[in-house]
Design a protein with these regions (language model features):
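Bacterial N-terminal signal peptides that target proteins for export
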Residues: 1-8
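Feature captures the catalytic ectodomains and active-site-proximal regions of enzymes
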Residues: 21-336
Length: 336
């Protein structure tokens, strides 16, 4: 039987003590967007049914959880996060896959849209990640190394994963323009994504960022947790390790909400949780992993949609007139 996550009673009571207030004017709201890398929608739903994710369940009770599909790009880290954090397709961002990418053009990210709408001095934009490869800010590099062999040629799962990581690394080294967020990094108020971190590392950074920027005014914080994806590649979707990683992320969600409440921020901070891609059921890869989700304490999120809808949803919740954005966002807000 899979182990259940347990939080101190005091923490659970704190979680239920206050709630996000939809009546807060949009231009007074802050927001946190969390990516659970590789979190398959069906597996998350199974965890909820087993009562293994009490903090996510509480968030959903306050707001909503809707189905999100990836429909127009490769289901991997670079392509998924490029669309999640811009709302645009690969034809605009230039981020096609983990192997084919360029820096996202300046001005297109959700961070920059918020700055354009409200001014850099009036909203802090923050990014904390758990992967250096795929979400790192690396600049142009050229490597003479040849591409790693296809993972399908590997003899076992450990070897496949080693080759996947090597292939991704070499793609980054051979890229003559830079990583997807190479240009975006310089526009942010704070960035911490230059090294791999587990949930504890990202979670502790998240608490520190909330404590630092929350009391000063409005903020938008993006957090990337890579643990589910890492365990999925190593042990497979459906494994105890994959499941335990999800339970761990739920624990950190509870701690972040508790910090928001301690700092008096939660009633005007919308929290959104999603994924860059899911996982192919029972496998160690995500080649056709289109099933993800969007969970939030924002009860106005009512419609299922696509990954390209996440950026306009968050922007609208924070008071941005998404109809005035150029180039026109291909997605729509999922809020009523």
């Amino acid at each position: 039987m899979l182990a259940r996550s347990r939080l101190p009673i005091a923490l659970l009571l704190l979680f239920s003590a206050t709630a996000f207030k939809p009546s807060t004017p949009p231009r007074q709201r802050s927001a946190i967007l969390i990516s659970w890398d590789g979190a398959l929608r069906e597996h998350v739903n199974d965890c909820l049914k087993r009562n293994q994710m009490p903090n996510l369940a509480q968030l959903i009770r306050e707001g909503r959880m809707v189905d999100i599909d990836v429909s127009d790009h490769v289901t991997d880290t670079r392509a998924g996060h490029a669309q999640m954090l811009t709302g645009y397709d690969p034809s605009v961002t230039g981020v096609v896959s983990n192997a084919v990418f360029r820096p996202i053009p300046l001005g297109l990210s959700i961070f920059e849209r918020l700055q354009q709408a409200f001014g850099k001095k009036d909203i802090a934009t923050i990014m904390v990640t758990g992967k250096a490869m795929g979400l790192g800010p690396g600049g142009p590099k050229i490597s003479a190394a040849t591409e790693a062999a296809s993972p399908n040629q590997a003899s076992d799962e450990d070897e496949k994963q080693t080759r996947r990581v090597e292939k991704m690394r070499l793609a980054g080294e051979q890229n003559v323009q830079g990583q997807p967020f190479h240009l975006t990094k310089g526009t942010l108020t704070a960035w911490d994504g230059d090294m791999p971190r587990d949930a504890r590392g990202v979670g502790q950074k998240a608490l520190a960022m909330i404590d630092k920027f929350g009391p000063k005014g409005r903020f938008f914080l993006f957090l990337h947790f890579g643990d589910v994806d890492v365990n999925g590649h190593k042990y497979g979707e459906g494994s105890r390790e994959y499941n335990d990683a999800l339970v761990t992320l739920d624990t950190w969600l509870g701690r972040m909400v508790a910090q928001l409440k301690t700092d008096g921020l939660y009633d005007h901070t919308a929290v959104y949780i999603t994924a860059d891609h899911g996982f192919d059921v029972g496998t160690t890869h995500h080649s056709k992993a289109t099933h993800i989700f969007l969970a939030s304490n924002d009860a106005q999120v009512t419609s299922a949609g696509e990954q390209r809808d996440i950026t306009p949803t968050v922007l609208q919740a924070m008071g941005v007139d998404i109809g005035k954005i150029t180039p026109t966002l291909p997605g729509k807000s999922l809020r009523k």
